[in-house]
Amino acid sequence: MMATKEEISMVGFALVAYAGDARTAAVHALDAAEAGDFDKANELVEKAQQDINEAHNQQTQLLSQEAGGAEMDVTFIMVHGQDTLMTTMLLIDETRYMIRMFKRIKELENKQ
């Protein structure tokens, strides 16, 4: 069985959409953390994680099909989707780290 280019492209579009939403939430989480609103930052990074999980689920479906022997034609939108997924996963990891950094900086500033 072969996944059609259209099916692969649709998964690519889904990856871009979910990962794009996740990226937006992660950037807003950084903004909230910088402003000292750590509850909002954590809420937004969790939303980013949920969105990236949806993107990852889309990716996993195609990977499972390919592992099962389905032939895949790579489309440019799929490459873009994969790129967006991976860079956003990294951004979410870094956002979690930076929220902790901003919180620590705020704690140190409050000690002065």
From Swiss-Prot:
Record the organism. Lacticaseibacillus casei (Lactobacillus casei)
Q: What is its main location?
A: cytoplasm
Which gene is annotated as encoding this protein in its UniProt record?
lacF
Name the job this protein performs.
The phosphoenolpyruvate-dependent sugar phosphotransferase system (sugar PTS), a major carbohydrate active transport system, catalyzes the phosphorylation of incoming sugar substrates concomitantly with their translocation across the cell membrane. The enzyme II LacEF PTS system is involved in lactose transport.
Q: Where does Mg(2+) bind?
A: 83
Q: Which UniProt keywords apply?
A: Cytoplasm, Magnesium, Metal-binding, Phosphoprotein, Phosphotransferase system, Sugar transport, Transferase, Transport
Entry-annotated residues carrying Phosphohistidine: 80
> What induces the gene encoding this protein?
Induced by lactose, galactose and galactose-6-P. Repressed by glucose.
Q: Which domain of life is it from?
A: Bacteria
Cofactor(s) the protein needs: Mg(2+)
Q: What is known of its domains?
A: The PTS EIIA type-3 domain is phosphorylated by phospho-HPr on a histidyl residue. Then, it transfers the phosphoryl group to the PTS EIIB type-3 domain.
Q: Where is the PTS EIIA type-3 domain?
A: 6-104
Q: Which residues form the active site?
A: 80
- Per the annotation, how and in what number is the cofactor bound? Binds 1 Mg(2+) ion per trimer.
Annotated compartments: Cytoplasm
Protein name per its UniProtKB record: PTS system lactose-specific EIIA component
UniProt GO BP: phosphoenolpyruvate-dependent sugar phosphotransferase system
Extract the SUPFAM superfamilies matched here: Enzyme IIa from lactose specific PTS, IIa-lac
Q: Which InterPro entries match?
A: PTS_IIA_lac/cel (IPR003188), PTS_IIA_lac/cel_sf (IPR036542)
Q: What is the protein's quaternary organization?
A: Homotrimer.
GO terms assigned for molecular function:
metal ion binding; transferase activity
Q: Which GO terms describe its cellular component?
A: cytoplasm
UniProt KW Metal-binding keyword? yes
* CDD domains from the UniProt entry: PTS_IIA_lac
